[in-house]
Amino acid sequence: ALDWVDVVSALSADPKATSELAQSISSYPKSSPGYFADTQKKVKDFVEAGQLGIFAKAYWGHPAYKLPPEANLMAVAHYLEALAWQRDVSRLHAIFGGKNPHPHFLVGGVPCPIDLDSDSAINSARLSTVQGIITQMREFVDQVYVPDTLAIASFYKDWGAQGEGVGNFLCYGDLPEKGIADPSSYLFPRGAILNRDLSTIHEVDLHAIDEIKEYVAHSWYDYSSGKESGLHPYEGETEFNYDGPTPPYEQLDVEKSYSWLKSPRWKGNVMEVGPLARVLMMYANGHEQTQELVNYTLQTLNVPVEALFSTLGRTAARTLETKIVADNLQTWQDNLVGNIKSGDTRTFNEVLWEPSSWPKKAQGAGFMEAPRGGLAHWIVIEDEKIANYQAVVPSTWNAGPRDAEGQAGPYEAALKGHQMVDPQQPVEILRTIHSFDPCIA
């Protein structure tokens, strides 16, 4: 958010005018002059004390910032509130997973038992807490996140023509209505879109050896079959071979190896994963709410459908996806309560819990649509021991280097043609890279 919002500019805003602006785009009840004056004072105290904290090391005053002071103050106030809101929402993870971050898990399900009469299980009080969080989440998304995104985006419509990337999108699929074995019931559909063509969704098989492959032609790894070859994760190898310059360094030779990431490809195609891929997949599948939200966004901003394939579109997709998920949370909560009332309190499937019940050799893939994109782990088990384990994470897809064919990954492709006002303050580059929500853990 702060790639588009000038925090220091908010100090010159008129809180009353900011309140009028906020009330013109939303019915959020906190949008009073006093609310924005308090935020302004808080930011002023940060600046005067030289303790900018989360606002430090930014490029405030950069000419690429286009928002008027009042819009900046509104966005900063809501940004600070979103931090607190995010903390409350993460309590859902703790309720169902024991803690956050890094919730507990159980092979075949979740670790939290359901017992309405127990103080240490999922009970009526915890279900009531969940309902309260869902209600709060939907209100914040509807009254703050969505209208703020549209308001801020209206000042940056030129970014609807920058940062496209590769134009290919991949989803593993997630959030099943009828169980993981039925991909047709996923809220996030599984599939691939090539060359921006939303009329055709290609089927994706995570287990097919000839579909997903990782390449290391420009990575600091070696394959026994040679650096030009590609391997499916079931056959994957992780052999380090760092031949780059001695750190620290300022420049890498991109004609050689230059990354610790591999280069995943689907049927040889560079693919983008993440919120934009999911929104496009839902849109192409005819998901009614997604189509309404996307069309409304395009009409409100008065930008063409091509603007979806951009830094602006990628950033907006995260907002629209949040709205879709927040609304569906209520349905999932109602289904959970309905199951409990009918006596269904199962939380995991123990059929394959005992290793002695496994075949002598087995392999499988666990997948999900993580916030930043498709995430999958592939495992090969022999004699009850792990023989091979490979993970292809979202930022590997998006941030991976060029492959043996010279195809740039989504990050590199999206940066093509970017112009910077000041190379020492590359806020333009940050906007596009941050639109992918990068994370290498």
Question: Model-derived features: where do they sit?
Answer:
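Active-site bordering "gate/hinge" segments
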Residues: 1-372, 383, 393-441
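A translation/RNA-centric and nucleic-acid-associated enzymatic feature enriched
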Residues: 377, 382
